[in-house]
């Protein structure tokens, strides 16, 4: 890139901007490059969750310690979450702490993407949008998904329903995964995640919306747009190679089980910046602080791939039973996410069979979780209620409603969406 003193970062997402902010504050010349027109441009106003149960320390306290201002973006806190069982029973997980923070992704001023962008610019970093650079010319690689391991489809809508979160485990509506309802200040999102590739995938979203409308009759939903997302889940042999730091999704630093990734994205950007500033060893710090959680999530995903609604029901029942005993709805789910010795053993046993080598990884030894095939139980026709939801969306689309995914294409195709799933 000409000037060896300058630090060039590929990707103006959360991990790249986090690193850029700390480096620029330390007096480094920092250039961030992104092929898109703005930070958050690959999202479309999607709501995403910052979970707060996998670690003892609150994520916003971590942000403060690292020097980031969380007031730069809108985050809505929840201490109650509807837990929806596969048999349609609705219970509530409650805590005296913060269970979730919901943030919006995209280019609006209040999004987390723009909040981190403003902090990077204020620190003195220069951001170059619509700028293509080569990986070998950059110090930090902070790109989004390249392959596809899972997808998510959602509908954003207007509603007069109060702020609310619902989290549903249902293998019929969300194969191998979950669906959710998020309502923030008059705008709602119903989303289903698919960890098995499907044909005519829009039926899963239609059926999921129909389910929520039947069980939350006061939604008063007016569709705005439909959005899609994909997740790319990888394990890297090296996180620093040939002088380059691979952060966030480029480093495979996210949750394989349910797709949470924003916390590790920011954290990995911080660790990369610290290494460059002589305050740490990125490879060692990633393996110490982040990889135990990633390996645990791989073991969890392997288990999730082998169960269905019967086990999902047991999980929901155990969660509520533990909450009744402990008085805190975060303890059970926190234990599921936190590293355990037996999950470390399970990871070593199953990862060779669960992950496939990526021949285009520039010698980094990247192994990717493939998008699993559909099962026989995934083949079904929409209900009348789902057909009505689809017809409602068709009417909204004719009036200008936009959609960011193809209706009938098989969901394994990368071109179906450029958004990211829960990260």
PLM segments and residue spans:
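Predominantly flavin-linked oxidoreductase catalytic cores and closely associated redox partners
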Residues: 110, 114-223, 231
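Active-site flanking residues adjacent to catalytic metal/cofactor-binding acidic residues
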Residues: 10, 33, 247-249
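FAD/FMN-dependent oxidoreductases across multiple families
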Residues: 75-77, 202-287
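N-terminal FAD cofactor-binding segment of flavoenzymes
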Residues: 39-82
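Active-site-proximal substrate-binding core of FAD-dependent oxidoreductases
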Residues: 274-315
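N-terminal Rossmann-like FAD-binding beta1-loop-alpha1 element of flavoenzymes
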Residues: 6-31
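Glycine-rich FAD pyrophosphate-binding loop
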Residues: 24-46
